Amino acid sequence: MTSLCLTIAPAVLSLICLSSYGWAEGDTTDNEYLRFGRENNNGYIRFGRNDPFLRFGKKSDPFLRFGKQDPFLRIGRQDPFLRFGKQDPFLRFGKQDPFLRIGKQDPFLRFGRSEPYLRFGRNDPYLRFGRNDPYLRFGRNDPYLRFGRNDPYLRFGKNDPFLRFGKSVDGEIEAGVDAVTLSREHEFAHENAASDRQKRSAYTDAIDKDNSLTSLVREAREASDSNGQINDGKVVEVPVFRDTRNGHYMRFGKKNEVDVTDGDTYDRDYSDSDVSNLLRYYGNTVPLPAYDKRSEHKQEYMRFG
């Protein structure tokens, strides 16, 4: 029942609309709204010659006509708004346009010689890149953004108190140091550097001497026999070479060995019975010490050089 009502209702509404349209056509033969004819002068959507709104005619269209006397959208000679003619006061690019004209006397957007705002001429006080610009000029006496010698703010010269990368005369960056100390440091800077070099060389010589003595003692201990006697009374001196990567602090390598005197831990000789017992109890589960063979190198630290 509901579906039947839904199908009948649109049909009834369409019949009512058709009957009303036929009644209107029978009553008025001249349609003033939907007709696109030429004779009716009171039409609205008609594109004829005398249409007062959307017509593109020659003389009588007051709004959208592009003729000679259109006061709004006409591009003629006397259009006061959107005309690009000689006397347009707003959007005209002529000689006397006071706003958007790019002529000789435009006070705002003109790129002439006497433009006070956006002109790139000689006397522009703001955005001019001339000789006397007080703000954005890159000349000789610019107090703000100039990269000259006497700029007090952003200058990279000799006496800049803020952002200067000078020698050491800046009173702001080196706070807490008086001028006398600064001047003396600057005078004797080379002498201080020489004394520092001498101290570093003396420290290096002491390190070299200590390393040489350590190497001699180690070689003598390795050359001794099992009874504590030195073979033939000779000690083999091994030259010690020191470079910048062999310091005292963090090094890799063999020159930083630590002599371990614990013979039970590192220099023990194992008998056959000890080895057989180890093999019987442990087998291949744990790494066994070398039998009848001493390690070539002793314990070493891993230091960065």
UniProtKB/Swiss-Prot annotation:
Isoleucine amide sites (modified residues): I75, I102
CC terms in the record's Gene Ontology section: extracellular region
BP terms from Gene Ontology: neuropeptide signaling pathway
InterPro entries documented for this protein: FMRFamid-related_peptide-like (IPR002544), FMRFamide-related_np (IPR051041)
Tissues where the protein occurs: Central nervous system.
Modified residues (Phenylalanine amide): F36, F47, F66, F84, F93, F111, F120, F129, F138, F147, F156, F165
Secretion signal span: 1-19
Keywords: Amidation, Neuropeptide, Repeat, Secreted, Signal
Keyword match Nucleus: no
Residue numbers covered by the propeptide annotation in the UniProt entry: 168-305
Location in the cell: Secreted
Family: Belongs to the FARP (FMRFamide related peptide) family.
Function: Can function as both cardioregulatory hormones and transmitters and may regulate cardiovascular function.
The protein's name in its UniProt record: FMRFamide-related peptides type HF-4
